[in-house]
Regions:
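Short pre-catalytic segments that frame enzyme active sites
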Residues: 87-101, 211, 241-244, 298-301, ...
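Active-site-adjacent helix/loop patches that line small-molecule binding or acyl-intermediate pockets
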Residues: 154, 162-163, 169, 173, ...
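Non-catalytic, structured segments within soluble enzyme domains
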Residues: 60, 147, 151-316, 413, ...
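N-terminal type II signal-anchor transmembrane helix
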Residues: 2-14, 45-84, 123
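Active/ligand-binding-proximal structured segments within catalytic/core domains
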Residues: 107-139, 364-386
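Glycine-biased, low-complexity coil/linker segments
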Residues: 20-22, 43
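Terminal hydrophobic membrane-targeting helix
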Residues: 65-113
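Acidic helix-start/capping segments at beta-turn-to-alpha-helix junctions
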Residues: 110-111, 127-145, 271-289, 310-313, ...
Length: 448
């Protein structure tokens, strides 16, 4: 007990007086500070804010987890037909007459996406759909009369496109911002970037990297070179001045030079990509129209990107062969022909010519002669005689009768309207006589 009493005495001496007086009766040199307390209302406000933030976070997670319609479903698309080696045979327009070919993100050269982000929205992966600093900069430049600066992010540009928003007014800009937040809440960054690359304007009636690469460079987006990728990266910012019929103008060259400087700042090892290395660009008028009959057939059966089995060199050879034969036999009245070349091992079509001239209406050139229905006629006769030989019904020197004969209600005639009497099987086949052929057919038994 004495021990606890001594401890209490020591503790009493160490603690300052509760009355505020010192041990000697003077004013205390220090006071024990009161325990801080928060106002009741402030505590409730913090709780409510935390609850609202948590609820918003959970709502965003649930919204992202819900199944969403693919962004690709926002439009209709072109179709592209390629040969076996990837050569473009045909690029069609979409139902709205736009060249727009949906190309998955993984089939777009990575340098294209990187260049687009460096030029259009370098903070894309970090902002929530809107870049406040860029918007403030753009607004300041607009109201101060300076050169206008773009403040729209990739997400905002995509929202304007797919929701058809007029962002030139303040109300429209607010709608665009809200739509960008809505997109970011529902789709991943990669989904949004993929959709932007497929909907970005490239001048005239060209939309998206997939269609632009085929029109301007006649190659798929996966095969673009660095200069070509940098070219496509700068067109969407001002498609009227840099794309379409104006491709290759000073406006495009200037923008491409700026883009090259930005790129080289991060990738100095990629030199040279200056103005003298600018890629040659084509127009939509130069799009190929190869193997038209085959392309038409494939387009009736499918859409999107279609890969044919034909070989361009074989196709060109077959087309030349048909053209030469028609020219050689023109005096004989032959004006049209069709042919198909099939690999006997794989049964793949390697070349197909449906007519002598697809654009010649006098010969119904757009009709695919390879698929046209026709009577087999005399083409069956060799098979009839061959089967008769196999079954022992006759041999080449067997004498047959070429005379008026009725086979039930059917009385065949010959192409020349005449009958020549007794004839060997060999001569009957060589001279394509109809009555002997039908006579042989009646002797055949059904093959096992």
């Amino acid at each position: 007990m004495k021990l606890f009493a001594n401890i209490a005495t020591v503790a009493t001496r160490l603690l300052p007086p509760a009355t505020g007086e010192g041990r000697d009766g003077g004013d205390a040199s220090c006071e024990v500070p009161p325990i801080p307390t928060f106002p009741r209302k402030r505590g409730k406000g913090l709780f409510r804010a935390a609850f609202a933030f948590a609820a918003l976070f959970i709502a965003l997670i649930c919204l992202r987890a819900l199944p969403q319609a693919p962004l690709a479903s926002q439009s209709q698309y072109s179709s592209a037909v390629y040969a076996a080696d990837g050569t473009l045979l045909r690029l069609t327009t979409a139902p709205d007459q736009q060249y727009r070919l949906w190309t998955p993100y993984v089939l777009i050269a990575p340098k294209v996406a990187e260049a687009v982000l460096q030029y259009e929205d370098r903070w894309y992966w970090w902002h929530p759909g809107v870049n406040p600093a860029a918007l403030i900069r753009s607004a300041k430049a607009t109201f101060s009369g300076e050169r206008r600066q773009g403040g729209s992010t990739i997400s905002m540009q995509l929202a304007r496109k797919i929701y058809d928003i007029d962002s030139r007014s303040i109300v429209g800009k607010l709608q665009q911002i809200a739509a960008a937040f809505w997109l970011e809440a529902r789709y991943s960054k990669r989904d949004i970037l993929e959709a932007y690359l497929n909907f970005a304007p490239y001048g005239g009636n060209i939309e998206g990297v997939g269609a632009a690469s085929l029109v301007y460079f006649q190659k798929r987006a996966a095969d673009l070179t660095l200069p070509e990728a940098l070219t496509l990266a700068v067109i969407p910012q001002n498609p009227a001045a840099r794309g379409g019929a104006r491709a290759g103008t000073p406006a495009l060259n200037e923008a491409r030079s700026r883009m090259a400087a930005i790129w080289l700042d991060r990738h100095p090892q990629d030199e040279p990509i200056g103005a003298r290395h600018a890629p040659a660009m084509k127009s939509a008028a130069a799009l190929p129209f190869r193997a038209p009959h085959l392309a038409n057939q494939l387009l009736r059966e499918g859409r999107g990107e279609i890969f044919a089995s034909i070989e361009p060199k074989m196709q060109a050879t077959l087309e030349r062969t048909i053209a030469r034969r028609i020219e050689r036999e023109r005096n004989s009245g032959i004006r049209n022909a069709s042919a198909i070349l099939i690999d006997s091992q794989t049964m793949q079509v390697k070349a197909l010519v449906g007519s002598a001239n697809f654009h010649d209406q006098d010969i119904d050139g757009q009709v695919n002669g390879v698929l046209a229905r026709r009577s087999p006629g005399s083409t069956l006769k060799p098979f009839i005689y061959a089967l008769a030989f196999d079954q022992g019904v006759l041999h080449p020197m067997t004498v047959l009768k070429d005379a008026p004969t009725a086979f039930g209600p059917f009385s065949p005639e010959n192409f020349d309207g005449r009958f020549i009497g007794p004839i060997t099987a060999q001569d009957a086949l060589t001279r394509s006589r109809n009555v002997p052929a039908v006579q042989v057919a009646t002797r055949l038994t059904r093959p096992n």
